[in-house]
Amino acid sequence: MKQLDYLRTVPRSGTGAPSVYLTFDDGPNPVFTPEVLDVLAEHRVPATFFVIGAYAKDRPQLIRRMVAQGHEVANHTMTHPDLSACGRRDVERQVLEANRAIRMACPEASVRHIRAPYGIWSDDVLTTSANAGLAAVHWSVDPRDWSRPGIDAIVDAVLASVRPGSIILLHDGCPPDELANTDASFRDQTVAALSRLIPALHDRGFIIRSLPQNH
């Protein structure tokens, strides 16, 4: 498997300002996804939400809100397993059921991208994604916000690593198998960091854009 089989960064094109891309994994969460959406709306910037299908099924109103606010809803599988430990049929089921759940929640959603749970890719995952018309997207900036390192640490980690074309990984929820851990689902640090990151990125000359449809 080659790294080029999935997108780590978006190549810069044209002569405009350098672009960066905000992405959120593991939602929608009933508490923190609305807060993330509020911050994005305040600053008028787009994002891509890689949602877990089971959550999309249970919280369709949040999927509809994402789409209504101009964000992209993307596939993060149905239940967030390690796909490298799954057989081909299980991989197909995880991907296709998540697509169906998103579209049932919001028929207007155009699902174009997928991110493998834990960023673990395999040939089966890439083949299944391509067959479903989904472009595979990884990331290039990971502040490990899920570990709750502190607001300053999240902001500093992003600003230290961001480059033109960077795909920034953040989290608005947590996987189903981590819900028993009380702290795992808290994304208050991510929300607070986001409200500082967006102006800081703009101050550095970056434009926050939606992921390209074709790449």
UniProtKB/Swiss-Prot annotation:
Q: What is the enzyme's main class?
A: hydrolase
Task: Write down any Gene Ontology CC term.
Answer: membrane
Q: Does the keyword Ion transport apply?
A: no
Entry's transmembrane regions: none
> Listed disulfide bonds for this chain?
none
Q: Where in the cell is it found?
A: Cytoplasm
* Residues binding a divalent metal cation: 76, 80
Tell me its EC number(s), please. Answer: 3.5.1.-
List, alphabetically, the PROSITE patterns matched.
Answer: NODB
- Among its keywords, does the record have Hydrolase? yes
Start and end of every NodB homology domain? 18-209
Task: Tell me one GO molecular function of this protein.
Answer: hydrolase activity, acting on carbon-nitrogen (but not peptide) bonds
Q: Which residue positions does UniProt flag as site: Raises pKa of active site His?
A: 145
The UniProt keywords, alphabetically, are: Cytoplasm, Hydrolase, Metal-binding, Nodulation, Plasmid
Query: What's the protein here called?
Result: Chitooligosaccharide deacetylase
Q: What organism, scientifically named, is this protein from?
A: Sinorhizobium fredii (strain NBRC 101917 / NGR234)
